């Protein structure tokens, strides 16, 4: 390869991938609720019903606080013992239940960052696992921006790439949601 020349994959794949990502974001924008943006406000709230209820972080923090020490595992092979604190996702779902679809609970939960650039999906029953947390603290201190402040997900049954940081939207759905890393070839379930 000559100096200044890009590898064939970078030359041909990056623009196509960028176009696919932009198209995917447009598609999601048409079918996913956009929180307070629709009302001309910030998208820093959560929306557990599709469409519907807007929640602030304070609405979530009234739920019981729970602490958990688990091993955080990265798919790259490293791991770390972490002390987490936050709200059980099961408590959140019980307090702000999904609207029924055809008389039954939706099957999936979709989450994305406030800017919509990162998004992931989960089975609803996995989100109800007693150790799945909406985290507000890590290692005895409030979450930092680097670790996903003000709210991130922790699932000790999943690899780290499924543990979304900076949650800006939560929606329930009966359709298996898009997932950022799955589109790049990673497993949708990411189970340990």
Residue spans of the language-model regions?
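Structured, non-membrane catalytic/scaffold regions adjacent to prosthetic-group chemistry
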Residues: 2-192
């Amino acid at each position: 390869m000559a100096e200044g020349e890009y590898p064939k994959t970078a030359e041909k794949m990056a623009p196509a991938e960028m176009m696919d990502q932009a198209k995917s974001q447009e598609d999601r924008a048409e079918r996913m609720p956009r929180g307070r943006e629709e009302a001309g406000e910030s998208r820093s709230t959560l929306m557990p019903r599709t469409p519907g209820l807007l929640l602030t972080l304070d609405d979530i923090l009234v739920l019981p606080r729970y602490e958990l020490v688990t091993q955080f595992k990265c798919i790259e092979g490293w791991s770390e013992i972490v002390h987490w604190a936050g709200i059980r996702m099961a408590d959140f779902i019980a307090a702000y239940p999904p609207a029924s679809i055809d008389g039954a609970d939706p099957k999936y939960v979709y989450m994305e960052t406030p800017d919509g650039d990162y998004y992931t999906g989960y089975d609803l029953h996995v989100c109800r696992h007693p150790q799945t947390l909406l985290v507000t603290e890590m290692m005895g201190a409030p979450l930092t921006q680097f670790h996903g402040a003000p709210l991130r997900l922790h699932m000790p049954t999943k690899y780290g790439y499924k543990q979304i940081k900076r949650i800006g939207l939560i929606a329930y759905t009966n359709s298996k949601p898009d997932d950022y890393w799955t589109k790049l070839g990673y497993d949708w379930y990411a189970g340990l």
